[in-house]
Structures are given as structure tokens and as C-alpha cells.
Amino acid sequence: MPRRYPEYTPERIKESKSYQVLLPKFNARRWAFGCSEWQDHGVDYSFEYVQDGFFHGFRLLGQVKGSSHLKFGNADSFSYALPVKTANYAVECSQPFVLFVVDLISATAYYLPLQDYFIANRDKYEKLKVNTSTISVRIPTRNTVSYADDDLVAVSYTHLTL
């Protein structure tokens, strides 16, 4: 019987392409990042904001998804089918958890801070209790990852409680 090995599936190729698009968009002088040791639990990357050359614990946990079929219903946002298990994990995290959705056609990376999203959309949060596989979230098209990253920096500060 021949040995079996993990397969490099089209889904894994899409995942690799999404990392290739997303990671160079971060300013490496302001963000340290690495593949997460929690990858099998929903976190693909951890990003830490570097302020004036020092680490202060301002972190983001990130789930990265790639798609060649994003549907922009209007110019302000688009809908994304988020796995409910990812949403539940995100809202329970003690650090800011960001969904990164990469448009593999335009090479644009969008982001959605999931805890903030479900706080602002309480009806969506309540739907997480229903036993479904996905929930539709709306991602603003203005939420793009780029060197002009002040909005993402602000998200990294949201865990502060002092």
C-alpha cells in the first residue's frame, strides 16, 4: 500500500496566494508578525504594532481568507460568509481579532475587526447562537490594508482596559 501525504489542494493554494497579497501590505517598520502557533484554532497570523521602535503589547490576531469571487453589492461594502465557529472564537478572544479577506483578482486586502463588528451589530451576535455553518458579515470597502495603517493601529489598542 503506498504512503499517503497531505495534499496541496486548490484551497491551500488560494490560502498561500492570500498570504502573498496580505503580508507585504503591512509596513514592516511598524508591524512585527508571524505565523501563529494557534493556526489550527482559527488564528493564522499574529500582528504586533511597534511604536517608536519598541513593543508595547498592541497585538492583533488575524484570520486570513482569500477569494476570487467577492460580490460587491454596493460601493460601500461587500458581504462575506464567515464560518460561525470562527466568529464565536473571535468574539471570545481577549485580544483584538481581525478577519482579513483578500480579493485575489484585484490583490486588495480588506479587514474587519470582528469583536467591534458584533458589538455594533447585536442582531448578528445573537444569530451566532443558532446552529448554522456560516453568518453573513458586511466588510466596508474603505477597510483596506495598506501602509496608511492608523485604523489598524487603533484596533490593536482596543484591548486596553486601564
Predicted features, each with a name:
Residues 1-11:
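Interdomain/boundary linker segments immediately adjacent to catalytic/signaling cores
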Residues 4, 27-28, 124-128:
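Intrinsically disordered, low-complexity coil segments
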Residues 15-76:
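Catalytic centers of nucleases
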Residues 70-88:
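Aromatic/His-enriched, Gly/Pro-containing loop or helix-boundary segments
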Residues 84-157:
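Mixed-charge intrinsically disordered linker/loop segments at interdomain junctions
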Residues 158-162:
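Conserved small/polar residues in nucleotide/adenosyl-binding loops
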